[in-house]
A protein has these predicted regions:
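Compact integral membrane and secretory-pathway proteins
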Residues: 2-171
Length: 171
């Protein structure tokens, strides 16, 4: 595999006419990459972490949006970079931006983002302690969707950057 194709061409970015996106609408893989990258932008605004604790007949819930975390903010910037990379046929740039999004989505998937419950910050230990006394429902839906859409964008961008030809005719 020729890894030199995965080096973003920053000189070409400076010469682009940004008023005219050059996406190849006949290329299904490029369209899939574009849709996945746009979905990554949308999924940053979903709750990346939510918890619902039911103890002693009382229910309490909290959630944290992906955009309110440092990795969500960086993820938004990288997802927008991936969208721009796909729109302007800079697939190497889109690939690396999507790979960073995958890593950030994985971090968001695994983390207990600092939640505020009862006016104080809940830690992972608080949630584990609550699990001993009641039912705890933990969700990472936004981070999971961000992770998978970024992974799809990364794979499609990699295929486009390396020039792999896949005959996918959906029309």
């Amino acid at each position: 595999m020729d890894f030199s194709k995965l080096n973003p061409d920053f000189n070409a970015l400076g010469r682009l006419d940004y008023s005219k996106p050059v996406i190849d609408t006949k290329n299904t893989i490029a369209l899939i990459a574009l849709v996945a990258a746009v979905l990554s932008v949308v999924f940053v605004f979903l709750p990346w972490f939510s918890v619902k604790v039911s103890m002693f007949g009382q229910s309490e819930s909290a959630s944290r949006l992906g955009i309110t975390t440092w990795y969500g903010i960086i993820g938004l910037i990288m997802a927008l970079t991936a969208v721009a990379g796909v729109l302007y046929k800079q697939y190497a740039l889109a690939f690396w931006a999507a790979v960073i999004c995958v890593v950030l989505g994985f971090i968001g998937w695994l983390s207990y983002a600092s939640l505020t419950m009862d006016g104080r910050t809940a830690t992972a230990d608080d949630i584990k302690l609550a699990a001993n006394f009641g039912a705890v429902t933990i969700g990472h839906l936004g981070a999971i969707l961000f992770f998978f859409s970024s992974a799809i964008a990364a794979v499609c961008s990699l295929l486009m950057a390396t020039g792999r030809k896949i005959d996918v005719n959906l029309r």
